[in-house]
């Protein structure tokens, strides 16, 4: 328990409710679950959603750590294992990600937070599941709460690995998303990144990443439009690499530029968005260069992988192999893999 409570409240301006919350952070066993849940609930109602926070000086430390990391250590037996390098850095630029509808989930993590009843229930589950209460465990429980799902980010370390092993001077990331591949590029030895992203709020986050790391001797060229619209110069690219939208699985925004809005049926999405994106890659790539696409079937849409391979071969790509990308383990359920299809022009 906090022993100098009067000093902290009278002279340093701490409120008693904050001190009780900090006591729970230190040792929640000093409180009953009912009392603790109410204290934690009131804390987050007062201070807001536990977004990822990172200080300015920390940003550069996170990137330097990824720069120094030997990414070849995470590639074995044709599998890429995940690490957390610079992931918090990525998420700090995209607070709106917590409000994005994902898969067939009924709620977003933000929906759970906004609902008094559901948020208290989530805190209670957090209290029982985890050893301690913190911003991190609250974020975790909001992600896995019943009928809730959060969007995922491509691991920057996995992106760096791909750039170092398949890239050249100029890389096109067709669907930038949450910045994992951009941060991975900034930590790599490659000199030029071209990114396309139609979502306005997500694009703003990407622009902030570019600005924060503009001291690096690299070129970052961002375009606020979809990959099916962007036409790179012929034979100008050394690598095309992305993880595109899985049709309407993640609804990043309600803007009409989103692929699931422009192409609202499976057939239109495959032949309008996916086909045109892969065609733009083929036209932009130099000979003997690679296109890597991380995309997977979903329970609702089982055509995605097959159509990606079909279109790529139809346009002239040769499929060399398929890499397995390790995804997060959810509450002890074991690891899951997604394919990264490797095509060569």
Task: Report residues per predicted region.
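Mobile active-site "lid"/loop adjacent to the S-adenosyl-L-methionine
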Residues: 237-277, 299
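S-adenosyl-L-methionine
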Residues: 207-234
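Conserved proline-anchored active-site loop of SAM-dependent methyltransferases
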Residues: 159-165, 170-186, 195-197, 227, ...
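N-terminal accessory regions of S-adenosyl-L-methionine
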Residues: 1-152, 296, 302-303, 314
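Helix-to-beta-strand junctions that scaffold the AdoMet/dcAdoMet cofactor pocket
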Residues: 284-287
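Short alpha-helix immediately C-terminal to the canonical SAM-binding loop
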Residues: 201-206
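Class I S-adenosyl-L-methionine
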Residues: 299-345
